[in-house]
Amino acid sequence: MRLSPYQNLRPEAFWRPSVAQAQARQIPNIYQKKFEISKTDRLMTAGSCFAQHIGATLRRHGFQVIDHEPAPLELPAWRHKDFGYGMYSARYGNLYTTLQLVQLAKEALSSGPPDLIFWKNNGCFVDALRPQIEPHGFHSLSELCEHRRRHLSCVRKCLLEMDVLVFTLGLTETWQHLASGRVLPLAPGVVAGHYDESEYSFVNLRFRENLQCMKKFFRVVDRARGNRPPFKLLLTVSPVPLTATASSSHILVANTFSKSVLRSVAEELAQSNDRIDYFPSYELITNPIFLADNYESNCRTISEVGVATAMSSFLSQHDPDYDSIGKDDAMLTAPLPLRSGKNFQDLDQSVDSAIACEEELLDRGRLLP
């Protein structure tokens, strides 16, 4: 007879043996895969800036991460990320919110004309839905439109051909273009355009709204794929805190709200759908035992060690060659940090960054006291 319902639970159910006493930066059994992801599966990656680390690690370990919008041959490799190439499976940049994801999918899979929301900048046209993919903007509106048409055909190809979508949930806060209803990856006025409250509104997506967006994404993509085999979804939550908040809350409170909502949405989806799995990169990096090592000095940028710690748990479940490689190898071959350097100035001004993250621009434009 048990004295307590906790008496015979496995060690992973208790904080002390499974977290506080964790050794060698490994937390055993924190992730048990729901389904196989093989190296022959076609993977589409998308999400907030942390998702770029995941895509880079998957490629390096031999997974088939599709890229249907590659850089032109004449563009030097060191310029690829300046133009949005090589970040994801197509040139859509960071998709920070669930609403951004479903709106892009609907646009790419529809037969209608592309949505054109643009800003003027020094005589050029900036695609407000992808403000960072052309550093100097487009010379004409027709050029912007043609690039967007081409881009959407690439996204459509990704959505129809993928076997697994790896999507990192990043933010709940976003800015909406009122006339079209489209949400933007970056607030107006940060890199181009200007903020006019009659044209744009701040939106903070709640639990129900995020959940509905993800369910709608499934319906839209499933309908377009027809008789193709059903795709699977691997969700993660970005451990990168918000750079700034447009809510009335303190940034720390706003960040906790945002990540809590997204984590809850991911859990609800994973618990209710056999085609959806959740990988706990958020928990692996934000856990208090390794917190000091997992972040750089700005308490926001994920360190090389932090990325490697998270991805080693993923690889141990999905890479059959991982044991022969060894766990220490994952640390040594981790993706570069979001921003190189060890102080705030270096982190803000690094030109060698391996990760493109538009949200960081919000801090650069603030009015200093």
Q: Across the structure, where does each feature detected by a protein language model lie?
A:
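Extracellular glycan-modifying ectodomains
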Residues: 1-369
